[in-house]
Amino acid sequence: MNSSLQVGIGIDVGSSSARIGVYNYYNDALLEMAQEPVPYYQDSSKKSWKFWQKSTEIIKALQKCLQKLNIREYEVKSCGVSATCSLAIFERDRTSNMLIPYPNEDNVIFWMDSSAVNECQWLNMQCPQQLLDYLGGKFVPEMGVPKLKYFLDEYSHLRDKHFHIFDLHQYIAYELSRLYEWNIEGLLGRENLNGIGNDGEVSGWSSSFYKNIINLPSNVSIGTTSLVANKHISTTVVRSCIDSYASWFAVASPHLETSLFMIAGTSSCYMYGTTISDTRIPGVWGPFDTILDNRGDFSVYAAGQSCTGKLIEHLFESHPCARKILKDGADIYQVLEQTIRDIEKNNGLSIHILTKDMFFYGDYEGNRTPFADPRIKGSFIGESTDTSMLNLTYKYICILEFLSFQTKLIIDTFQNENSNIHIKELRISGSQAKNERLLSLISLVNNGVAIIKPKENVDMMGIKGAYVLAKSAKEKKQLADVITERDISNDSEKFESLAEYRLGNDSILLRKLLCVKYHIHLDMAKQQKRYHKLVDEVFQHL
């Protein structure tokens, strides 16, 4: 290694792994990449949060990656960190001033945790509607602020302790800066221009929000507030963000206002950028005003669903035929695709015609957007005692239909009559971008919308976007300028749908069927809300 080689680092901490990429600072070429597993834990019987991680395991995994990459042998110009929208909790030792995981090593409330239902109800009653409209109309349990409120109600009475609560990405960036003696100036807590925390995370809110609504105790600090900056003078610039935004930064279209980005993995998130706007879109988060620049010239809107790719994982984990395929070591997606082709050939009908009487709704972890309703759950009409390969295939198709309908609902929500948004292309990254049948369905149910994919490995977009984030800060450039001025035509490609899903090739009957099933999809959500209301009425006068 040559210590004079100047590099930038991109870090992406996802739901189950940590990845680090080292990029040539001057030509943006990926030089090396390292990856380590990072587990999350689940126990639905716990009284407190049900999903968690350990910050110690995350940092150790990242240190292993950095050691593999011999990072100290480079001249590091910048480091970008992206991580899930989880919450990290620490107690500050009064003697050493060190941060200690609290209440024990299980100190990261995982993004997937939705325990803070009561706290959401309290916040939605306390906050003015004008504020809530920036969050799609309501706080939802997976956001950072409800998780913070949950923690405060449990622990803030312990006045002999001083707590630090971080958005996970900010903590990781702070801790790595401390360990590697990088500059943390860019991580110091600042209010967003409109005083709203991006995606409901704990940083970025106005001081009046924490004082007047949350009533934040004096023994609780948010992020790096009151932490002493390292004394080392370093020119290595460090920045951090939620992982979904990093993936967007990597592949965002220069034509922001006609392009919607979708990062689709375990969950799915959507991002849309436009020139500054104060328009609130019902069911959509935003506008947020400091993500693409700090001048207030651009607004960002976001939406998301908690359980998307996880639906397929759950099917594979729970269905006996899927378990056998996985046990045998076969590629389950290839097996399913071949089975679909065989079924269609033998029946002379589209697989969707054969599943016409099966209706799946998959908000297993509640609905983030556009309904902001944690009580909505999964449902399936068409269940039987069948556990054959045919049944597995049909259920897989039903999940793909649900995911395509869900994406259509998000696009329709963005394009409501008052938003003045017109989506011409959908850019997709993440593990679901590898599923050609799913992408074909999404395009078809959205009237043939163009789907753009990265040419590079879709799993690498998080580290690339994190690198872009920090490099732009190092060069004192606005992200919006970097995105709108660059040419990424060689980095992305238009996806060609499978023949049976292309407009003009698909049968009129199939298109009519999917249209009807989309309206059934909407009705299934509506009926759940109706059932909840009927049940609630039983308890109103007790």
Swiss-Prot record:
PANTHER family assigned to the protein according to its UniProt record, in alphabetical order: PROTEIN MPA43, RIBULOKINASE
UniProt xrefs under InterPro entries: ATPase_NBD (IPR043129), FGGY_C (IPR018485), FGGY_N (IPR018484)
GO CC terms of this entry: cytoplasm; mitochondrion
UniProt protein name: Protein MPA43
Note: Present with 1050 molecules/cell in log phase SD medium.
Biological processes per GO annotation: pentose metabolic process
Pfam families: FGGY_C, FGGY_N
GO terms for MF: D-ribulokinase activity
Record-annotated membrane-spanning stretches: none
